[in-house]
UniProtKB/Swiss-Prot annotation:
Protein name: Monodehydroascorbate reductase, chloroplastic/mitochondrial
Role: Catalyzes the conversion of monodehydroascorbate (MDA) to ascorbate, oxidizing NADH in the process. Mediates phytotoxicity of 2,4,6-trinitrotoluene (TNT), an explosive and environmental pollutant, by reducing TNT and forming a nitro radical that spontaneously reacts with atmospheric oxygen, generating reactive superoxide. Can also use 1-chloro-2,4-dinitrobenzene (CDNB) as substrate, but not 1-chloro-4-nitrobenzene (CNB).
Keywords linked to the UniProt accession: Chloroplast, FAD, Flavoprotein, Mitochondrion, NAD, NADP, Oxidoreductase, Plastid, Redox-active center, Transit peptide
Catalytic reaction annotation: 2 monodehydro-L-ascorbate radical + NADH + H(+) = 2 L-ascorbate + NAD(+); 2,4,6-trinitrotoluene + NADH = 2,4,6-trinitrotoluene radical + e(-) + NAD(+)
Superkingdom per UniProt: Eukaryota
Subunit structure, as described in the record: Interacts in vitro with TRXy.
Outcome of gene disruption: No visible phenotype under normal conditions, but enhanced 2,4,6-trinitrotoluene (TNT) tolerance.
Organism: Arabidopsis thaliana
Length: 493
């Protein structure tokens, strides 16, 4: 098996399609067996740690957030809402920007200039969650110190001290780790480092890709997940020869049923996108100018490309925090229902946190903006107040593609719940489509494309309540609207 095949296979097989929460990370055995007693959700939040007086004049900080993504921005807002930010909170980020809504980077940020692309400061947090736009000036006005372009390189938990790349030392009272993930990369020896090969996690990554798109003619996107789908849709707006390559048999295998995948694949083909499915990549080839020029497959065939985007998953950005308790089965830093690690005074939120998924009684790690926002808010409320309710997250996934001006069909789907059990599909892009997952007679998950605001609001109610539904009656529905009415009636019975 080639090195790339191993990387791509790992990215796909570590997220199984049959055992629940297949969108994000594998589920682990029940919490009762896996969750140690020391992670009790009720108890002292400060334990034996020492309190640190806030003073930006010296190196002490009462609260420090490491990371500058969605979770950091929403955590900062929650500190402000509780009157605990001014002169007390410090955010340390490796990026040059204040926290922003990261999903934009593979959506509107990639639109060509004539399609009105998104740009900062337009999508700073917390606009994606309906909140105020937190520009750099907002942090200054709220008395929040932000240290830009200086990532944390070391941590001494006994001394409650962080050291940055530049050598700056920060002493903290409470530490919130919100470092997110890093993109999985192709090894350098097979061309993963070549000019014209792109990975997207930050604004700088997206800017580099846009520079390539402006000159590109042929683009190959490696990975059939939602990142690959979003980048491919953006490439269509640039009028590029676009090919998606992935090892699975269908698009977005972790969520879509084969029938649903077939419908979306046809939609992409109508927009000129080509698919190479079940493919293993041997290496990326360089042209005479040193830039990527082709993607060579394991079967010996090649696909010409002057731009390649790798979207094969991500890994928790553990960095200097590897000595904290980790969850070895699903990755990430182990936390309890209040996002406390086993080390007093240290919390982890967002993509990097392995937490108890209360609704399904298992541990998980979720790489999604919705969880980043909600985990940040829950963690800070628990840290600052007497709030002791454990986090009760309902898995949620969405994507929006082809939303630029002139697109014949704008696509927006939402999913809530657990994609397990049998499925019922209703509709045929007329203009809607819905898929229901049913296990032991109960509705476990539901996906709707092009729903109304009222229909989208119904989905989490259905997924959380898991009502008993008549599968045959759902299957006989003549429209998505009728199917949702049947499900809603089951909810109310």
């Amino acid at each position: 098996m080639s090195a790339v095949r191993r990387v791509m296979a790992l990215a796909s097989t570590t997220l199984p399609t049959k055992s629940g929460l297949s969108l994000w990370c594998p589920s682990s055995p029940s919490l009762a067996r896996r969750f140690p007693a020391r992670f009790s959700p009720i108890g002292s939040r400060i334990a034996s740690r020492s309190l640190v007086t806030a003073s930006f004049a010296n190196e002490n900080r009462e609260f420090v957030i490491v990371g500058g993504g969605n979770a950091a921005g929403y955590a900062a807002r929650t500190f402000v809402e509780n009157g605990m930010a001014d002169g007390r909170l410090c955010i340390v980020t490796k990026e040059a920007y204040a926290p922003y809504e990261r999903p934009a980077l593979t959506k509107a940020y990639l639109f060509p200039p004539e399609k009105k692309p998104a740009r900062l400061p337009g999508f700073h947090t917390c606009v994606g969650g309906g909140g105020e736009r937190q520009t750099p000036d907002w942090y200054k006005e709220k008395g929040i110190e932000v240290i830009y372009e200086d990532p944390v390189a070391g941590a001494d938990f006994e001394k409650q001290t962080l050291t940055t790349d530049a050598g700056k030392q920060l002493k903290y009272g409470s530490l919130i780790i919100a470092t997110g993930c890093t993109a999985s990369r192709f090894p350098d020896k097979i061309g993963g480092h070549l000019p014209g090969v792109h990975y997207i996690r930050e604004v700088a990554d997206a800017d580099s890709l846009i520079a390539s798109l402006g000159k590109a003619k042929k683009i190959v996107i490696v990975g059939g997940g939602y990142i690959g789908m979003e980048v491919a849709a953006a490439a269509v707006a640039w009028n590029l020869d676009t090919t998606i390559v992935f090892p699975e048999d269908q698009l977005l295998q972790r969520l879509f049923t084969p029938s649903l995948a077939q419908k979306y694949e046809e939609l992409y083909r109508q927009n000129g996108v080509k698919f190479v499915k079940g493919a293993s990549i041997n290496n990326l080839e360089a042209g005479s100018d040193g830039r990527v020029s082709a993607v060579k497959l394991a079967d010996g065939s090649t696909i010409e490309a002057d731009t390649v985007v790798i979207g094969i998953g991500a890994k928790p950005a553990i960095g200097p925090f590897e000595t904290l308790a980790m969850n070895k089965s699903i990755g990430g830093i182990q936390v309890d229902g209040l996002f406390r690690t086993s080390t007093p005074g240290i919390f982890a939120i967002g993509d990097v946190a392995a937490f108890p998924l209360k609704i399904y009684d298992r541990m998980t790690r979720v790489e999604h903006v919705d969880h980043a926002r909600r985990s940040a808010q829950h963690c800070v409320k628990s840290l600052l107040t007497a709030h002791t309710d454990t986090y009760d997250y309902l898995p949620y996934f969405y994507s929006r593609v082809f939303e630029y001006e002139g697109s014949p069909r704008k696509v927006w789907w939402q999913f809530f719940g657990d994609n397990v059990g049998e499925t019922v599909e209703v509709g045929n892009f007329d203009p809607k489509i819905a898929t229901f997952w049913i296990e032991s007679g109960r509705l476990k998950g539901v996906l709707v494309e092009s729903g109304s605001p009222e229909e989208f609001q119904l989905l989490p109610k259905l997924a959380r309540s898991q009502p008993l539904v008549d599968k045959a009656k759902l299957a006989s529905a003549s429209s998505v609207e009728e199917a949702l009415e049947i499900a809603q009636a089951a909810l109310q019975s």
